[in-house]
Amino acid sequence: ANFDPSCTGVYDRELLGRLSRLCDDCYNVFREPKVATECRSNCFYNPVFVQCLEYLIPADLHEEYQAHVQTV
């Protein structure tokens, strides 16, 4: 996974990998090139990431992912 310089929190390779994989999966579903880049923008703190999260991840895990975003 590429390291996003906009992430200024904890550098946790595993967490960043999970967030990045969500963006990859989202891109694979929607096949829109901008999805992959926008999902990662602002260190995953953006509306595209939230849409991907809601579409791909069970609702009971949303808070966990949101906490990851705030960590990195």
Curated annotation (Swiss-Prot):
A single GO molecular function term of this UniProt record: neuropeptide hormone activity
Disulphide bonds in the chain: C7-C43, C23-C39, C26-C52
Keyword Secreted on entry: yes
Protein known as: Crustacean hyperglycemic hormone
Function as written in the Swiss-Prot or TrEMBL entry: Hormone found in the sinus gland of isopods and decapods which controls the blood sugar level. Has a secretagogue action over the amylase released from the midgut gland. May act as a stress hormone and may be involved in the control of molting and reproduction.
Chief place of localization: secreted
Annotated signal peptide: none
Any GO CC annotation of this UniProt entry: extracellular region
GO biological process, one term: glucose metabolic process
Cross-referenced Pfam families: Crust_neurohorm
Valine amide modified-residue sites: V72
Keywords: Amidation, Carbohydrate metabolism, Disulfide bond, Glucose metabolism, Hormone, Neuropeptide, Secreted
Similarity comment text for this entry: Belongs to the arthropod CHH/MIH/GIH/VIH hormone family.
Subcellular location: Secreted
